[in-house]
Amino acid sequence: EGFGVVTQVGSNVDHLKEGDAAIVTWVPREPINGRWNAPPAGATWQEEPLAGSTYTWGEDAIVWGGYAVKVDDDSPRDLASIVGCAVLTGAGAVTHTAKVRPEESVAVFGVGGVGMSAIQMASVLQAYPIIAVDLDDAKLEFAKEFGATHTVNASKVDPVEAIIEMTGGGVDYAFDAIGLRITNEQILPVTRSGGSGAENIGGMAVLIGMPGPEMTIWPGHFMFHQRQY
C-alpha cells in the first residue's frame, strides 16, 4: 500500500508522466498467454535494475506501468495509499470472485480495512442484507457507515446461528476477511443450502487471503447442500 509521485516513466508508459501523483497496487499486468504471470522480484543484475514487485518502505520503487495508477494531486496520501491493497482486495472479492448481484445477501467476517471494503462494495452493488461480523461493537457500528445493514458480535452470540436465523436459512455469500481457523470454518455453514439438480447450487464462502494451516470442513456441505468454497 503506497502513495507517491512519479519521477520517471518508461518509453511505453502513456498513462503517467513525471510529477503525477499515483498509488501502487498488486494488480498484475494483463496476461498475454492466458496465465497471470508475476513479474520478477525487484533486484539488480550487473548494475542493471530488474523491475517487478511493489515496494513501499523505500524512497523509490521501480514497478511495471500497470502497477501504478494516477490519482488526483490533492488526494489525501494516508487514505489514498490503502486503495492499492486493502480496498482492491476486499472490493475485488465481492465483484470478481463472488460476482454479487443486487438483492443477494452477504455476510462479512472481520471489519478491518479489507472487510470494510467488501461491505462497501456489496452496498454499491445493492446487496441485501449486508451482515457485518466482528468482536468489537465500535467497529460494527462503524461498519454501518460503509453499508452494513445488520451486525453480529461474535463474542456475544454464535454468528452461525445468528446469521441463519437472521436470514431464514443463510446468505448467498459469506466472506472471511480475518483468516483465522474459526472464521475459515464458519463462513461455509452460514451460506444457504442448495438442493438437487445441477442448477440448484447453494451459497458461496469466499476466503479473502490465505487460510490457516488447518481447518475442518464437513464434506456434507458440498455433497448434500451444494455449498461452494
Regions found by a protein language model. Give the residues of each.
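Well-ordered beta-strand positions
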Residues: A21, E59-D60, P129, H150, ...
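Glycine-rich beta-alpha junction loops
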Residues: A22, W26-R29, Y67, G179, ...
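Mid-domain Rossmann-like dinucleotide-binding core that forms the NAD(H)/NADP(H) cofactor-binding site
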Residues: Y67, D72-V157, E161
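Glycine-rich beta-strand-centered segment in the early N-terminal region that forms part
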Residues: E1-I32, D72-D74
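Glycine-rich cofactor phosphate-binding loops and adjacent beta1-alpha1 units
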Residues: A98-R101, L135, E141-Q228
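Cysteine-cluster motifs in flexible loop/terminal segments that predominantly coordinate metals
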Residues: H15, T25-G66
